[in-house]
Structure formats: structure tokens, C-alpha cells
């Protein structure tokens, strides 16, 4: 029987959600895609390629790493080293952006035009490489982090612990936005411009932030990610590590993937759930990657206001995540997931149909409310379907399936926009891309209906 871990350990685990959500929002969602596509004039497809390469790397490496993690029952070292590398690569984006891009900072806010400057392929190549490494290592840490939860609380408390972690993560989103936005435009969202002396001092203190613009947000994001991950590095531990070294080969690791797929059939609903995760995680990842550029391009929000938009939308996500954790323990993770994904389908259709920015705000607030439901409920859902000692390889398999799907999602979005925009206009192209995401959610619902109700973790 799993005993509740000390408060300091559980809090440090939850605080890692706070840390990695700063990266997820500031880099994967808010600043990098807009900087690359709007400021530097690159195509949506180029961004999708960088995202897809990181997903392919996850697909190729996670089976081996998950097998090694389960064999030695050690999760923390993987979380720690992947996080450190992600922070270094994230900072490298800012360094490269301010040393290899010919026009930087505030000058890129108006974007690259057909008659103006264009960054060279060599410059863009290394920026994409840094982003790919940062995104890959950020994603690769997730299955090991999620698997740590099984040893931190008894099964009946998994929903609440997962919900607290997700809610704390969205608090991290807000804190990350507030602390990084002064490096972008010298102001705080909802507050306005900061004193020039304060902004100048911040940019002097933090290296490679001396220019305004999105390029100056990546180094502060990396530092915040590392800072708030430190408590997990220091206070969390692997509860039942195997001290003997275990040899794991790539061939055996990928053989274990097939074995895990076969073993999933022994646990009712596990296969259908993993396939559903394949689809809904792809859908969420695609929306997260392109929401900022959708708001600017399709809804015509003024450039720079996407920070305020995401800040406001994150507030209901905090309460929604905690509520989802409570519902997960009350009615079960399956029902919570079904309700959350049905809400996603309805709200994305509404987002396509709303004609005004006010309507978009309303729909966005509701999306924020349900946004944390999936990560909150899916961790207890998987733990309720499988034996606890196999958590590492099944969490790795779930990440593997979602990353394999994620190769398709952003690429389909990028191709849809690039093909339809010249023919039907920007608004139609981006709304058509959202329809592809709705289809992914709808298919995942059909699969989740085949998963039985479960309330306790298998032992």
C-alpha cells in the first residue's frame, strides 16, 4: 500500500508543473511561433517541421528510456537532466536570436515583408535546432515526472494531487507571463508600461535581453523554468530504486513497446485509452502551438496583446484544474475526461463561429475553464488501468503515442493554412485548421466510450 509522501515532497512535485508550464506557455505557445512566423516571416510549415522533429525524437528515444527507468525504478534523474538541457536550449534561442538574426528586437515587431529583409537559412536553421532540442527535452521529461506521482499519494488521492499539480502549473503560467512580459514590451499586461529605468535595469541584469521584442523572452523563460524546478531536484526522491545496473538495448526497448501494447490488452480499457490519448493530446498540442498566431491572424488582435489574452484565459484554468481533480476523485477519471473533451468540441466549434473579438474572449474564458481537465484526469485514469509498478513504461507508451500523433497535427494545421490562405483568405484558412482539431477530439471521444469505469489503482 502506498503511503502519502511528506508534504514537502508532494509540494515540490507539484511545483515542477509550475516550472514546466512557464516554458510551455512562453515558448511553445506564446512567443516562439509568433516570433518565427510573424516577426521573421517564416512559414507555418517550417515551425511545424521543428515541432514534428522534436516529436519524432521522443518517439525514437522514450521507449528505451522508459524501459531503463522501469528496470531501475529511477525517475528523478531523467526529469532533472532533461529539464537542465531544455533550459540551456531555450536560452540558446534567445542568444542565437540576438546574435545571428540581422534584424532583432523591437525592429522585428512589424514583421518581415516581401519587400523587406529576410533572415538567412543558416540563421533560421540554428534557431530551429535550439527550439527542437528545448521542445524535445521538455516533452521527454513528462513520462518520468508523471510516473513519480504513483509513489507520492495513495490511489484515492491521485485525482486531487494531479489537480493540484495542474492548477499550480497554471499559476506558473500567470507568473511566467508577468515576469517575462517586461522583457518583450517593457510593460505588464493589464497594468501598462513600466518605468524605463526599471526595464533598463532588468535588461542589464539578465543577459541577452537588451533588445525589445519576443527575442528577449527566451533567456528569462529558461531561468524561471530552472529556478522553479530546483525543489523537485532537491526534495523529491525515488522511493524504490534498484541499485544494480541493468543493461537495456534499443532492440529490447522497442521490443518492450510491442510487449507493452500486448500487455495493455490484459488490462480492460488500457488500449482504447492509449489510442484516445494519441488523438486528444495531438489536438491539444496543436491548439496550444497555434493559438497565439490564430488570435492575431484570424481574430485580428493587435500585435502584442496575445500576452494579455493568455494571461486572462489562464485564470479560469487554475480553478478548472482543481475542480477537475475533485471531480476525478468523485465521479471517476473516465467521466471527467469524457465531459472535458465534449466541452472542447463544443467550444472549438463556437470559436470558429464567433465573428467578434468579444465573442472570442467569451469562448476563450470557457476554454480556459476546461483546459486543465485532460492532464488532471488522464494521469489517474492510466494509473487506474494498470499495475503501479508498470507506470513508467505505460506513461512512456502514452507519451509515445501522443508524440507520434503530434507529428501529424501541427503539420496538418500548417499545410491547411499555407494552402487555403492564398485561395480563401487568412480567416477561412485558420478556421479550417481548427476544424481538423475538432475532428481529432471527436475521434478520441469514440475511443474513450470503450474504456470501463475504474476507481482504484491496480496493484
List PLM regions with ranges.
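A membrane-interface helix-boundary motif in multi-pass transporters
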Residues: 184-223, 415-440
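Multi-pass alpha-helical transporter architecture, strongest
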Residues: 10, 94-97, 224-235, 435-459
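Hydrophobic core of transmembrane alpha-helices in multi-pass small-molecule transporters
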Residues: 83, 89, 95-96, 102-141, ...
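Intracellular juxtamembrane helix-capping segments at the cytosolic ends
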Residues: 140-153, 373-387
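Structural signature of the two symmetry-related core transmembrane helices
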Residues: 77-92, 335-350
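Juxtamembrane intracellular "pre-TM" segments in multi-pass secondary transporters
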Residues: 1-10, 238-275
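Helix-to-loop junctions at the C-terminal end of transmembrane segments
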Residues: 60-74, 319-332, 417
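Helix-loop boundary and gating motifs at the non-cytosolic
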Residues: 2-59, 269-302, 306-309
Amino acid at each position: 500500500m502506498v503511503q502519502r509522501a511528506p508534504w514537502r515532497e508532494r509540494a515540490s512535485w507539484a511545483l515542477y508543473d509550475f516550472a514546466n508550464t512557464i516554458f510551455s506557455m512562453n515558448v511553445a505557445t506564446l512567443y516562439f511561433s509568433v516570433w518565427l512566423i510573424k516577426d521573421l516571416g517564416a512559414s507555418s510549415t517550417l515551425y511545424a517541421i521543428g515541432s514534428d522533429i522534436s516529436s519524432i525524437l521522443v518517439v525514437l528515444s522514450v521507449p528505451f528510456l522508459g524501459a531503463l527507468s522501469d528496470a531501475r525504478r529511477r525517475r528523478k534523474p531523467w526529469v532533472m537532466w532533461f529539464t537542465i538541457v531544455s533550459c540551456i536550449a531555450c536560452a540558446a534561442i534567445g542568444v542565437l536570436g540576438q546574435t545571428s538574426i540581422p534584424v532583432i528586437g523591437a525592429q522585428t515587431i512589424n514583421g518581415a515583408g516581401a519587400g523587406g529583409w529576410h533572415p538567412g537559412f543558416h540563421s533560421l536553421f540554428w534557431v530551429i535546432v535550439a527550439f527542437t532540442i528545448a521542445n524535445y527535452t521538455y516533452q521527454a521529461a513528462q513520462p518520468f515526472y508523471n510516473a513519480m506521482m504513483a509513489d507520492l499519494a495513495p490511489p484515492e488521492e491521485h485525482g486531487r494531487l494531479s489537480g493540484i499539480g495542474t492548477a499550480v502549473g497554471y499559476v506558473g503560467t500567470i507568473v511566467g507571463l508577468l515576469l517575462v512580459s517586461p522583457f518583450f514590451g517593457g510593460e505588464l499586461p493589464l497594468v501598462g508600461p513600466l518605468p524605463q529605468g526599471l526595464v533598463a535595469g532588468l535588461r542589464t541584469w539578465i543577459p541577452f535581453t537588451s533588445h525589445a521584442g519576443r527575442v528577449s523572452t527566451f533567456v528569462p523563460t529558461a531561468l524561471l523554468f530552472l529556478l522553479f524546478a530546483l525543489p523537485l531536484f532537491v526534495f523529491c526522491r525515488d522511493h524504490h530504486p534498484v541499485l544494480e545496473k541493468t543493461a537495456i538495448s534499443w532492440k529490447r526497448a522497442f521490443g518492450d513497446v510491442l510487449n507493452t501494447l500486448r500487455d495493455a490488452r490484459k488490462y480492460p480499457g488500457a488500449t482504447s485509452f492509449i489510442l484516445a490519448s494519441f488523438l486528444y493530446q495531438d489536438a491539444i498540442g496543436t491548439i496550444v502551438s497555434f493559438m497565439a498566431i490564430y488570435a492575431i491572424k484570424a481574430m485580428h488582435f493587435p500585435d502584442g496583446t496575445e500576452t494579455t489574452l493568455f494571461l486572462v484565459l489562464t485564470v479560469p484554468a487554475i480553478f478548472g484544474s482543481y475542480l477537475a481533480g475533485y471531480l476525478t476523485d468523485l465521479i471517476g477519471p473516465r467521466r471527467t475526461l469524457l465531459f472535458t473533451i465534449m466541452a472542447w468540441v463544443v467550444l472549438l466549434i463556437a470559436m470558429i463561429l464567433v465573428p467578434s473579438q468579444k465573442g472570442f474572449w467569451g469562448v476563450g474564458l470557457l476554454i480556459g475553464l476546461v483546459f486543465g481537465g485532460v492532464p488532471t484526469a488522464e494521469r489517474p485514469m492510466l494509473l487506474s488501468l494498470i499495475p503501479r509498478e508498470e507506470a513508467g513504461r505505460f506513461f512512456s507508451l502514452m507519451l509515445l503515442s501522443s508524440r507520434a500523433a503530434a507529428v501529424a497535427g501541427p503539420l496538418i494545421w500548417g499545410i491547411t493554412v499555407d494552402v487555403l490562405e492564398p485561395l480563401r483568405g487568412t480567416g477561412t484558412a485558420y478556421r479550417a485548421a481548427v476544424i481538423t482539431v475538432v475532428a481529432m477530439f471527436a475521434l478520441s471521444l469514440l475511443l474513450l466510450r470503450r474504456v470501463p469505469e475504474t476507481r482504484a489503482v491496480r496493484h
